[in-house]
Amino acid sequence: MAAHSSFPIAVPQDGLDTARDVLRRTFGHADFRGLQAEVIGEILAGRSALAVLPTGGGKSLCYQIPALVRPGLGLVVSPLIALMADQVSGLQQSGVAAEKLDSNTGLDTRGDIWRRIDRGTLDLLYLSTRRLDAAFDVGAPVVPAPCTCGHR
């Protein structure tokens, strides 16, 4: 995504205001940095977005905040189990209903997570690529729509 887009972006201001409120209340940041607002605005407007940002550039917020603003479950697919664990832990400490499913997740915990998904009490689910592949192999429950996805 370029810093200066040649395409007009029509994002309702109330959507970005809500996103800024979530940013302040949940993550403790005063405002977005760099291209975060533009990327989040695109996602909130229902469009695809590609953000190539440096390490520490705030990529995670670009998919976490839309998942918290929009209804439904946010699904993040990642091959990095340690990063998933760190992000889920941080989100949980901030009061976000987040969980992860990876090759280390026990059967009982997996069942609890699927029940939370079914009840609609989970905001974000981090899923390892291996667990995603295994879910298709064994016919695990399908994640209900609507779903906001990250790391795509």
Model features per residue range: what roles?
Residues R20, G74-V76, I81-A134:
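Conserved nucleic-acid-binding Ia/Ib motif block in the N-terminal RecA-like helicase ATPase lobe
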Residues A2-I9, G41, S89, Q93, ...:
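ASCE RecA-like P-loop NTPase motor cores
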Residues F7-P54:
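Conserved pre-motif I regulatory segment
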Residues D123, R130, D137-R152:
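SF2 helicase catalytic motif II
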Residues I40, Q64, G111-W114, V138:
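Short hydrophobic/charged patches on amphipathic alpha-helices used for structural packing
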Residues G46-I65, L75-S78:
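Walker A/P-loop
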Residues A67-V69, L91-Q93, R115-G120, A140-P146:
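Conserved catalytic network of the ASCE P-loop NTPase/AAA+ motor domain
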Residues G46-A49, P71, L122, P146:
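Short, high-confidence coil segments that cap the C-terminus of an alpha-helix
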